[in-house]
């Protein structure tokens, strides 16, 4: 493995290998994982779990992303957003990228097994395989519902963080997964509308390509309504308090606004603006969960 990586060191820089891990995507995942850890306990999270647990989850997420670069290199070469990625551009060979992914996954699993618990480690591995193999290798090319079905893998981080602390499953982290699961379709379908021509050229059956933009916009609006309702459940089951409820209502109302604007096609660049807002939405929603958790502890 080290030989493969060294063989391409003349062409690739550390930035290329960092790019393989999709660091911005992984950062958002780690924020939700971190929130899951803190929500799991009324006491402090042990620093070893906090540090090495999140590092292990992040390394495994980076490994899945690196595999995605290899499997999607033909698609990436067609799309303007991705044609300069390291594997597609030839700066990192597919073999080197896979070796790098194996290295990250091994290190990540090792950290999780050493510093958290077996359930957290195996759930993380299942999430890695779900994204890298089931979604990237099969679903993405097989069905316009690829994002809906494959969204479970991407929704796992708060569950992984929670289980890393507690060592067992419960309803609360599954609700956090459900929030991200409901958020995923409007998030990705908005981008798919913006990049519809490129997905069509790459022969990827994204919903706007197979069913048209109007159909997709209707479903973005419907999923946003579902997501809005789901985000109120933490308050309904007394998992969170008034601060979170107010934030969820305000953030959700803004998301619904963008989904409606996109549906009505009433503003230019509505699709990409909906996509961009959705990223901030998820980040701020989970920060609100965290802030509310500690506010309740101090009351």
Swiss-Prot record:
Task: Kindly list the GO molecular function terms attached to this UniProt entry.
Answer: protoheme IX farnesyltransferase activity
On whether Transmembrane is a keyword of this UniProt record, the answer is: yes
| Annotated keywords | Cell inner membrane, Cell membrane, Heme biosynthesis, Membrane, Transferase, Transmembrane, Transmembrane helix
Reaction catalyzed? heme b + (2E,6E)-farnesyl diphosphate + H2O = Fe(II)-heme o + diphosphate
Q: In which pathway does it act?
A: Porphyrin-containing compound metabolism; heme O biosynthesis; heme O from protoheme: step 1/1
The enzyme's first-digit EC class, named in words, is transferase
Q: Which GO terms describe its cellular component?
A: plasma membrane
- Which CDD domains does the entry mention? PT_UbiA_Cox10 (cd13957)
Query: What is the protein's membrane topology class?
Result: Multi-pass membrane protein
Q: Report the locations given in the UniProt record.
A: Cell inner membrane
Q: Is Cell inner membrane given among the entry's keywords?
A: yes
- TM spans (from-to): 25-45, 47-67, 95-115, 119-139, 147-167, 173-193, 218-238, 243-263, 279-299
Q: What is its EC number?
A: 2.5.1.141
GO process terms (BP): heme O biosynthetic process
Q: What does this protein do?
A: Converts heme B (protoheme IX) to heme O by substitution of the vinyl group on carbon 2 of heme B porphyrin ring with a hydroxyethyl farnesyl side group.
In the record, the note on similarity to other proteins reads: Belongs to the UbiA prenyltransferase family. Protoheme IX farnesyltransferase subfamily.
Extra facts? Carbon 2 of the heme B porphyrin ring is defined according to the Fischer nomenclature.
What is the protein name stated in its UniProt record?
A: Protoheme IX farnesyltransferase
- Recorded source organism is Ectopseudomonas mendocina (strain ymp)
**Gene this protein is translated from:** cyoE
């Amino acid at each position: 493995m080290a030989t493969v990586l060294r063989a391409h060191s003349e062409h690739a820089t550390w930035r290329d290998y960092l790019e393989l891990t999709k660091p911005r995507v992984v950062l958002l995942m780690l924020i939700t994982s971190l929130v899951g850890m803190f929500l799991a306990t009324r006491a402090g999270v042990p620093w070893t779990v906090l540090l090495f647990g999140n590092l292990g989850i992040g390394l495994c997420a980076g490994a899945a992303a690196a595999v995605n670069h290899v499997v999607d290199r033909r698609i990436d070469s067609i799309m303007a957003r991705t044609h300069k990625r390291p594997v597609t551009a030839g700066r990192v060979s597919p073999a080197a990228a896979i070796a790098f992914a194996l290295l990250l996954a091994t290190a990540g699993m090792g950290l999780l097994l050493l510093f958290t618990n077996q359930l957290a480690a195996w759930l993380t591995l299942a999430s890695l395989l779900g994204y890298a193999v089931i979604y990237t290798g099969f679903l993405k090319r097989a069905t316009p519902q690829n994002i809906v079905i494959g969204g479970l893998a991407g929704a796992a981080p708060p569950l992984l963080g929670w289980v890393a602390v507690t060592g067992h499953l419960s309803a609360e982290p599954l609700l956090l997964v459900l929030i991200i699961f409901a958020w995923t379709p409007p998030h990705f379908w908005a981008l798919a509308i913006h990049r519809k021509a490129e997905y069509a050229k790459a022969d990827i059956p994204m919903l706007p390509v197979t069913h048209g933009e109007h159909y997709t916009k209707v479903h973005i609006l419907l999923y946003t309504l579902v997501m809005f309702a789901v985000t109120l459940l933490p308050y309904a089951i007394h998992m969170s308090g008034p601060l979170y409820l107010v934030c969820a209502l305000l953030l959700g109302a803004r998301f619904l606004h963008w989904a409606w604007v996109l549906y009505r096609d009433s503003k230019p660049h509505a699709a990409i603006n909906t996509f961009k807002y959705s990223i901030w939405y998820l980040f701020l929603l989970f920060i609100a969960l965290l802030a509310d958790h500690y506010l309740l502890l101090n009351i």
